[in-house]
């Protein structure tokens, strides 16, 4: 995370297809999710899905959101993850929604802060330092994107990423 604080990170950006990236990540996570009895559902609706991003960092950001969905699931229930891509005006959107334990309303504003961790009441043995979502936000911000979090305790969480569409020159 310190490399982001110093702004010394150098992105190796290239043109990629978000729909393809999402399908690959969903495929990678399917066994972990199915192991809980759950499933990943994808709605690939974006027509303009070209993005200009650093593949490693952007993929890590999406993977982090998926990983959190699995880690913070309700222990007694299968986790279902719903991934959707779509376009609206000149933006490309990606949402990742789960039916996990959710986040209290007062904690939603803090989830992107460095070292902030939502207290889970020791239901989960989740390791970490509270840097994952701060990293995700920084990566999205540095790609001229936006990320927002919606959640309801006991019902699940949804992260929505918005990016500029890459147009042909």
Language-model features: locations:
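Short beta-strand/loop element within the Bergerat-fold HATPase_c
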Residues: 78-90
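Short helix-loop "hinge" at the ATP-lid/N-box region of the Bergerat-fold HATPase_c
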Residues: 69-70
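Short helix N-cap motif at coil->helix boundaries in the Bergerat
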Residues: 18, 102-110
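Acidic ATP/Mg2+-coordinating residue in the GHKL
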Residues: 98
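Conserved micro-motifs of the catalytic ATP-binding
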Residues: 6-11, 50-53
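Conserved catalytic submotifs in the C-terminal HATPase_c
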Residues: 12-17, 34, 39-49
